Amino acid sequence: MKRLFVILSNIFITSFLLWICFSTSYVVIHNSFPAISIFSQNKEVSKDQVKYSLDQLANETDSVIGEQIETIDDKGKVHFSYAIFGSGHIPNGLVKASEEDFYNSGLLSNYYILSGNLTLDRLNHELQSLGFTQTFVSYPNIFLSLFTYMGNGSQLLVLVIFLLTFIALMIIQKTKEMRTVGIRYISGLHLTQIFGNSMISDCGDLLLGIITGVFLGICGVSLFHITPFSIPVIFSASITYNLLLLFLSILFSFLYVLSIKAVHLVSLLKGKLPLKQIMGILYLGQLVAFLLIVLTIYRTSIYSTIWQLHQAGDTAWSNQKDWVLLSTNREFGAEARNHDSRKMLEEQWKSFIETGIQNGGMLVQHPLASFDLKGLSSHPLMGKMSINDYNPYANSLYVTPNYLDVQNVELNEEDKKSINSLGEGEFGLLLPEKLKDQEDKLRQIYEDFLAIRNDKGNKIQQAMKARVFYISNNKKRFVYNSTPISYQQFLSDPILIVLKPSSFGKNRNDFFTYPSDYLYFKGLDATKKLVEQGGIKKYISQYDLAYYVYRGMSHNIQVEILTIIAGGFLGIATSILLFNTMTILYFEEFRKTILIKKISGLNFFELHQKFFIWQIVIFILGGAIGLLLTNKLWVVFLTSCVFGLNSILILMHRSRKEDRMASIILKGA
């Protein structure tokens, strides 16, 4: 049973890592080489100058340097290739960039030492001498990558459950072997030999697990065309996991040998164990298992809520498949931080965004990123607030006029015409009818919020005036949420604030000055053409169809839920193993006492009163800790019920077995 578990757990971990490496291959590659990331430069330098300097450096140190090149295909997806400096060859698994891609790419990128004697310090010094600043140095660290992949949320829970299961299986195995080992010990077998035999058996199981995991990893990398740099990650994961199991094996084998020495020889022949120590370990394991199930149920409830919130927008998104989001690169970030180039950059982007809006683009800016799953937030200006509060930071949706048409917001033609004719210094304030009596107050709040102020914020440069309109109550407004910060897709009866780029004149503003996750452009091909015409192509790192970003988030949520559920089943299976082991040991210690009490007429609960008391103590302690961790009483109650029922059923099952052995026990066996 233990060997089968070791093999299956290695298969599970390897399969998970194959999926991670497949979906984030560029991250695996980045973590496989010494790298320097460049974020800004303080002087102009040409591609040829960089190529000459890095070629020379690579040849001097007999090394190969690679620059990561990002290219965007016709569907807007990013592909990575590598420009090579030096006379060496590109490592297998990397795609060599074409000369055209190299010269069309930016200079602010990642530079890797792919092979050779070159050090990161020298490469960093060379890059800084070319005028590059704000460099970030990273060394390859497989174990850090493993911690990133396995040290979060559900993955960590599953790993702990695996370790607990292994402990339970070891105790069961050692319990069954105790009588045989006792006979061998009495026959003259030394304790070191007993320890050695135990370790050899466990090492054989773990070696088989490593071979299975690595073989599956190599086959998976080849079959699914995953980057070959995944193999060291999978190999390291398999070694690390099995070393953890080996540590547990050494620890329990050592305790096993000590227990043999501590127990009387006659007791050994009967298969007795030092039950106090082992029961203590099992109670601790049971407590951990209890807490793991609490966390599993809690996380499942959270992700179920997330899934419901996210899926609420599925139908709405399915009719909105051609909206495009733009992602910017490091060149954009560097120029935005540069005081000299910032003004020109702002003008360039304002012009592009205005053209994009005129060609069907849309602003839909919501406040959801500031609120938790319960719809609560703490704002530095407004204090504690709910998503349903009516203020500029809560139940407000900032949109362009075409949102009203796309989402069929109920307005008459006269109101639509008035909104479309908004001029400089004007915006539309669409209030649900239930807020009519608060019109003056809300008008003042939003006019003050949208007013353009100077850098110090104490003087209004441009006042903003609201045109007020009324819309129906009890409406849910689709917010086009494709960000992973929040999963909600609708706001209930929000105030709609209608804005146009021209509303702010030439002033810098928070809506139409820079790209954001709230600006959507119409059609992939049309957006690419606008980017080309606007002269901002060099700043774009990626075109994303918002619908597929949303679908990707749905997939990630599903995977997380399935991982949590799988972890939950494993946790329950582990707890059953622990309970079963405890009941075996419990009857081993108190078999005759239980039988005598049963003959005297005590019922089931009176017979096992001591056992139930300890279980209740575990439940109370686990429940208290679980309540502190989750603040969810129903989760703790449900877990206690599951564990309590599990305990009673296993105890009843074992009790029936013991009844069949009653005649043997009375004879003194």
Show which residues each predicted segment covers.
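C-terminal membrane-exit region of the final transmembrane helix in multipass inner-membrane proteins
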Residues: 242-275, 642-669
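Membrane-proximal extracellular/periplasmic loop immediately following the first transmembrane helix
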Residues: 23-86, 300-408, 413, 417-418, ...
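Short helix-loop junctions at transmembrane helix boundaries
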Residues: 214-242, 616-644, 649-659
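Interfacial "coupling" helices/loops that link adjacent transmembrane helices in transporter permeases
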Residues: 167-203, 578-614
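"Rare, low-scoring activations can occur
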Residues: 43-146, 426-564
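Selective transmembrane-helix segments that form parts of the transport pathway or gating/packing helices
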Residues: 5-12, 192, 196-217, 241-248, ...
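N-terminal membrane-entry
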Residues: 143-162, 236-244, 551-579
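Internal/C-terminal transmembrane anchor helices
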Residues: 271-304
